[in-house]
């Protein structure tokens, strides 16, 4: 929160829980305030701009390639370089939020120069908030947000009910679709591991707050590399799991949520990576787990 871990590449590449931004901080504003200032307004409904997919904010996995830059001033102080704007559903109108801990000049090889320093406008009589001034620069910059990489195209992958709805229809959400037709019918698959111990993990979605700590833990446990801002912009981040954040409701300025949906590496029972690995670095254990033998891996990424 104050930049003490700014030189940690794992944490810089960890997506923000709400806006999925990596390697940067931004100035968060509401959709209504963005329209008032004329920032991050898409030319059409399919253009990705900071925090939205064109004019549609709800039930989409928006993101951006470019965000408008603004200057932020307060009591004679000014953030040393123009700050990118980001539209945040649920953000209060006429309020701008910028996270501290970025824009450090001597953080180290990883953290130096990343982001924008909110400390430039922090004052002893206004440590956390105050009435400032904002000016649009007429320029844009690229922000590495992973939201755009997993657009769900309106598919109902996250389902939310309150207690009354669940009591009225307890079977809600238990419907199962049939398997797609295949040349290799599922019923004929050889169930080699069905007689052994079954491993599984459950996640209480009522408790998950989208902190992403499990994403970093997985990265540390599995030696997953950091790829950097440029490669994240190319959808090449290598995390084995992610925590999607969704908003619902019909009012873009007062949405429901956020709701968090973990999307995990599945430890597949019939893992396709095991079949294609040329050096048998990924193999199946006797208990049905998808195991990795690191000293065999040659990095083909098949």
Regions found by a protein language model. Give the residues of each.
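A cross-kingdom feature strongest in bacterial/archaeal respiratory oxidoreductases
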Residues: 1-239
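Long hydrophobic segments that form regular secondary structure
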Residues: 18-21, 28-40, 196, 274-289, ...
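Short, well-ordered strand-loop elements centered on a beta-strand within folded domains, enriched
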Residues: 81-83, 93-98, 143, 252-263, ...
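Cysteine-centered iron-sulfur cluster-binding motifs in ferredoxin-type domains/subunits
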Residues: 200-222, 259-280, 289-302
